[in-house]
């Protein structure tokens, strides 16, 4: 049985494109494979931003203060597939997701610095990025403004996750026709996806 960690970050709990696509993805896997899904909703259960207390706790090995970070890292290692939902906010990701990233990007836990450069420790995992974007960012004048997809891929690669599938609905806020076309493409992509 494959284990999936389903991470949600959209502040729109209803009418969220990324949440709808994420739900469709999980439903697809449940209907075609034996899977166990754990959900981490970063809006309903927000992760504390790192701060001076967090840095001091790391320096002093204060496990009480690091408990949340340790739990989030444990979830990464326990699951085979990490499905991350992210709408694009201000050309990037929601702050809730950034806080999660800051809590899992911990040297000697999810990556090491070696003589040959950084080495990711979260190996043999697959990631699925479930992205939504109000505009078209894959081409044209807005392309250089997309700090969402490449950032998430870079983070995942850095910690050792190199098998990454991107499911992206673009232009969902432009007009109904573009939105519908994009959602149909995503629907087909999900149908063709296996784990």
Curated annotation (Swiss-Prot):
InterPro entries per UniProt: Flavodoxin_fold, Flavoprotein-like_sf, FMN-dep_NADH:Q_OxRdtase_AzoR1, NADH:quinone_OxRdtase_FMN_depd
Residue ranges the record marks as coiled coil: none
Pfam families: Flavodoxin_2
Record's cofactor remark: Binds 1 FMN per subunit.
EC numbers: 1.6.5.-, 1.7.1.17
Any GO MF annotation of the entry: FMN binding
Keywords carried by this UniProt record: Flavoprotein, FMN, NAD, Oxidoreductase
Catalytic activity: 2 a quinone + NADH + H(+) = 2 a 1,4-benzosemiquinone + NAD(+); N,N-dimethyl-1,4-phenylenediamine + anthranilate + 2 NAD(+) = 2-(4-dimethylaminophenyl)diazenylbenzoate + 2 NADH + 2 H(+)
The organism's place on the tree of life at top rank: Bacteria
Residues holding FMN: 10, 16-18, 88-91
Cofactor requirements of the protein: FMN
Enzyme class at the top of the EC tree: oxidoreductase
Family designation: Belongs to the azoreductase type 1 family.
Subunit structure as annotated in this protein's UniProt entry: Homodimer.
Role, per record: Quinone reductase that provides resistance to thiol-specific stress caused by electrophilic quinones. Also exhibits azoreductase activity. Catalyzes the reductive cleavage of the azo bond in aromatic azo compounds to the corresponding amines.
Stated name of the protein: FMN-dependent NADH:quinone oxidoreductase
Lineage: Bacteria, Pseudomonadati, Pseudomonadota, Gammaproteobacteria, Thiotrichales
Gene: azoR
